[in-house]
């Protein structure tokens, strides 16, 4: 029997076209077992290598919007093999989506060589902040874990229209900018803190509209700053620090570059201790968040002592000054009385079990009102209602992080600064060793949104959606581990919600597990 080369080529071409049609039809009608895809999956590319007997199928990002399991992946390959015409059904088949083989996206999958996704990367030193007045020290749960958590959007300045506005529409007498704060701040953050975690928020968390600054370079509200010498006196540190002034901040002003920092040698004996007293003058009694600041220098210690006196009660903290210098560091929220006395103050000592240096800078009481001027005006609202872009500037974040749009687009800047601020804090830690930063071991960032939408039938947007990003930076986090860890967490979070909420609310939709490139992820 004779067959010309042209006939062979024609036959092979027809088989390839048949394979492509069948695969396109299969994937277009594909529905995952758990959940749904927001749009039908589409095949972007089909490559068949007859010499190596390999079929490579590249899917679009919609196909990644599902939780892959061992059984679901096996089923996909089995179905694809049945769809392919002979001889392609005997070839090695590889299916890709978002730059990875689908079998590599199985939740809980291990990296090559049998190592778990996390490997041996872990932080085991002193936490950034620890309340040492607690009757017991946790050893499990989330102790020594540092998380970044924020609630949706916030008030921002519309550069094109020239006024401040909410990012999301009004709905049921509120909007997402306001509503999500009422879930994240009083419930979610405390739950994680009670489990042992230290939680950082790139948005102001304190709803208190009053704000009092006490600092060696000048204080607000006629508050009192006092240094008490011990064996050694407090001296000026060789770095810039916070400097307070009444009024608003302009575009690129950094309040942590216009003041000074004080420092002292550490001591162990009580008789040798020095103190710095921060005594605010409260115009009204109430609950105020307490933020401290300091500088991280050579010789900084992991257990700087801070004592918060609130209505005569005493709560002691250890702050790891080997990380996180040059910004506001949250200690807690306390009840304070009206006035200015020793029953309501913060005291920093130079007590430490380590030989080295204690530094101290400004202490802030209360969330306050927004003070970042844009377009000649401030928002006129409490800082906690503003977007993260404005808090970042008040917290000493460099201009390049909170103004990626060079001052022309506050909306875009607000979205970008949340993750960039987390990277700025976490750079140099075990989780972000390749970037420069404050060395805070942040191992998770999570944004919580209500999705702020509406639909004609009122049902399509009800339910839960999780978003992660795996196809970025060659599929790796800065620590070198696979970004699949993010998808594993997103899937676990979504599964937990779908386990818990239906128990209370009966019908609850699992919307999507999106693997997309969002700035926040």
Functional labels for PLM-detected ranges:
Residues 311-341:
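Extracellular carbohydrate recognition and processing domains
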Residues 150, 387-483, 513-521:
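Active-site microenvironments of hydrolase-like enzyme catalytic domains
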Residues 256-282:
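Short beta-strands within extracellular/lumenal beta-sheet-rich domains
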Residues 346-357:
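Short beta-strand-plus-loop segments that form exposed binding edges in beta-rich domains
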Residues 9-52, 125-126:
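N-proximal, solvent-exposed amphipathic alpha-helical segments enriched in charged/polar residues
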Residues 274-298:
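A short beta-strand element within beta-rich, extracytoplasmic domains
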């Amino acid at each position: 029997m004779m067959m010309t080369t042209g006939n062979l080529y024609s036959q092979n071409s027809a088989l390839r076209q048949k394979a492509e049609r069948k695969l396109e039809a299969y994937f277009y009608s594909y529905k995952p077992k758990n959940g749904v895809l927001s749009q039908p999956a589409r095949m972007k590319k089909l490559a068949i290598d007859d010499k190596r007997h390999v079929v490579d199928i590249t899917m679009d990002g919609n196909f990644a919007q599902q939780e892959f399991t061992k059984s679901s992946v096996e089923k996909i390959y089995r179905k694809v093999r049945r769809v392919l015409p002979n001889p392609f059904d005997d070839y090695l088949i590889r299916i890709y989506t978002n730059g990875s083989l689908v079998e590599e996206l199985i939740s809980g999958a291990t990296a090559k060589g049998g190592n778990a996704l996390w490997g041996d990367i872990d932080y085991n030193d002193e936490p950034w902040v620890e309340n040492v007045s607690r009757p017991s020290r946790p050893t499990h749960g989330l102790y020594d874990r540092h998380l970044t958590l924020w609630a949706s959007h916030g008030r921002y300045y519309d550069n094109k229209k020239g006024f401040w506005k909410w990012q999301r529409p009004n709905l049921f007498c509120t909007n997402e900018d306001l509503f999500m704060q009422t879930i994240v701040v009083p419930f979610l953050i405390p739950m994680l803190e009670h489990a042992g975690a230290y939680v950082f928020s790139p948005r102001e968390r304190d709803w208190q509209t009053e704000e009092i600054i006490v600092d060696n370079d000048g204080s607000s509200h006629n508050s009192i700053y006092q240094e008490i010498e011990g064996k050694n006196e407090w001296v000026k540190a060789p770095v810039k620090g916070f400097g307070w002034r009444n009024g608003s901040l302009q575009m690129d002003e950094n309040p942590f570059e216009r003041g000074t920092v004080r420092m002292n040698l550490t001591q162990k004996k009580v008789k040798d201790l020095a103190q710095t007293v921060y005594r605010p003058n409260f115009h009204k009694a109430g609950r105020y968040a307490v933020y401290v600041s300091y500088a991280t220098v050579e010789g900084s210690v992991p257990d700087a002592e801070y004592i918060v006196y609130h209505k005569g009660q005493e709560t002691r903290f250890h702050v790891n000054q080997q990380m996180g210098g040059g910004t506001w560091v949250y200690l807690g929220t306390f009840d304070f009385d009206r006035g200015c006395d020793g029953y309501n103050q913060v005291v920093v000592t130079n007590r430490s079990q380590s030989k080295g240096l204690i530094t101290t800078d400004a202490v802030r009481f209360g969330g306050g009102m927004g003070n970042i001027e844009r377009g000649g005006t401030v928002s006129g609202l409490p800082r906690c209602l503003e977007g993260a872009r404005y808090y970042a500037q008040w917290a000493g974040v460099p201009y390049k992080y909170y103004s990626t749009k060079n001052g022309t687009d506050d909306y875009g800047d607000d979205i970008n600064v949340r993750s960039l601020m987390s990277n700025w804090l976490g750079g140099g830690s075990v989780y972000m060793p390749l970037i420069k930063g404050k060395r805070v071991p942040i191992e998770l960032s999570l944004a919580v949104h209500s999705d702020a939408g509406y639909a004609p039938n009122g049902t399509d947007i009800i339910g839960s959606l999780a978003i992660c990003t795996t196809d970025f930076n060659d599929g790796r986090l800065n620590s070198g581990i696979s970004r699949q860890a993010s998808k594993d967490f997103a899937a676990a979070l979504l599964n937990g919600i779908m386990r818990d909420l239906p128990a209370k609310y009966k019908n609850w939709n699992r919307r999507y597990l999106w693997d997309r490139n969002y700035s926040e992820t």
